[in-house]
Amino acid sequence: MDTSRKIIHIDMDAFYASVEQRDHPEFRGKPLIIGGDPNKRGVVATCSYEARKFGVHSAMPTRQAAKLCPNGIFIHGNMAHYVEVSNQIREIFSRYTDIIEPLSLDEAYLDVTENKKGMKSATMVARDIQQTIYHELGLTASAGVSFNKFIAKIASDFKKPAGMTVVAPEEAEAFLEQIPVTKFYGVGKVTAEKLHRLGIETGADLKKWSEWDLIRELHKHGYHLYRHVRGRSNNIVNPHRDRKSVGKETTFEFNVLDSRILEQSLMQFAKKVEARLIKLQKHGKTVVLKLRYSDFTTITKRLTLNEYTNDANQIYQAAALLLRESYTGQDSIRLIGLTVTNLKPVYFENLRLEGL
């Protein structure tokens, strides 16, 4: 395991909302929700920390957000402007290193093992970046510093907003043991529920399980979690990383015959894919359905749409059509997945912030 790398994960704090509050003094200190008209079928893209106190969060239906936060200020947002500010932030990153892996408009990994400023400490680099972003752009960022991407990302969320958490190699396992497994990158709702049923709530609980037992219960997630909780992750910061697809899949606890359950899963996946596409500022043209039967036979079907989309309704309708064409209901399903491929950036087009 390589512990010599110096990796920083920078995550802007409530990015879209913070830009709006910076630019519009009347929004400061108030619960601001980016996501459009709460009287229509929309989804929250992000919200200010004032709104989060009421339980509002990203990917939540705007109608639900309005019930939780009746005095919230709802706006559609200005995606073109957020792209512009994101580019300004990345320009600041480039003053320190060229090894930058953007994850979305508001977060990125930086490898500062050899940095342009000649700073020996990654902590100093991270603090300098935070201060530069604040002084030049009037925005706050949180930072995680460690020797690999997995730990750095978890650490950046540890002391939000405007915080920084540093995890040295000798501290990694103790740090990860105290973290709820729901905070582990890559652990979604379905995996979290499985872990909960197994009595695994923290990294310490996870560490008690053998590699074989985790793989048996969680398949590939178990393989990765066994390594992650021990600080083993050597994925490099990849400046040329370009996501080719966005998808979601789940393995059912019990094999499923009922097509209605499969359709419900596809609807949930479509919502999550929409939220991720919005965050990545991309839309796609091809919808892919994946089915794995109880005998482990796996099929994939795809449908190319007439136009690019990041709309959950359109994604779901395409996936449901593929399901009706592919599934007869005679054999039970072990796994179902939905992926949108053939992606391209939205950038200055009118990115849809309203979904389901």
UniProtKB/Swiss-Prot annotation:
Major localization class? cytoplasm
Q: Which organism is it from?
A: Listeria welshimeri serovar 6b (strain ATCC 35897 / DSM 20650 / CCUG 15529 / CIP 8149 / NCTC 11857 / SLCC 5334 / V8)
* One Gene Ontology term, aspect cellular component: cytosol
Record flagged with keyword Cytoplasm: yes
InterPro entries in the record:
DNA/RNA_pol_sf, DNA_pol_Y-fam_lit_finger_sf, DNA_pol_Y-fam_little_finger, DNA_polymerase-Y, DNApol_IV, PolY_HhH_motif, Rev_trsase/Diguanyl_cyclase, UmuC
Function per UniProt: Poorly processive, error-prone DNA polymerase involved in untargeted mutagenesis. Copies undamaged DNA at stalled replication forks, which arise in vivo from mismatched or misaligned primer ends. These misaligned primers can be extended by PolIV. Exhibits no 3'-5' exonuclease (proofreading) activity. May be involved in translesional synthesis, in conjunction with the beta clamp from PolIII.
- According to its UniProt record, the EC number is 2.7.7.7
Q: Where in the cell is it found?
A: Cytoplasm
Key word DNA repair present: yes
Boundaries of every UmuC domain copy: 7-188
GO BP terms, alphabetized: DNA-templated DNA replication; error-prone translesion synthesis; SOS response
Required cofactors, per record?
Mg(2+)
What is the name of this protein? DNA polymerase IV
Pfam families attached to this UniProt entry: IMS, IMS_C, IMS_HHH
What enzyme category does the UniProt record give? transferase
Homology family: Belongs to the DNA polymerase type-Y family.
What gene codes for this chain? dinB
Quaternary assembly: Monomer.
The site feature described as Substrate discrimination is recorded at Y16
| Manner of cofactor binding, per the entry note | Binds 2 magnesium ions per subunit.
The record lists the membrane-crossing segments as: none
What catalytic activity is recorded? Answer: DNA(n) + a 2'-deoxyribonucleoside 5'-triphosphate = DNA(n+1) + diphosphate
- Cite the binding residues for Mg(2+): D11, D106
Active site location: E107
**Entry GO MF terms:** damaged DNA binding; DNA-directed DNA polymerase activity; magnesium ion binding
| Taxonomic path | Bacteria, Bacillati, Bacillota, Bacilli, Bacillales
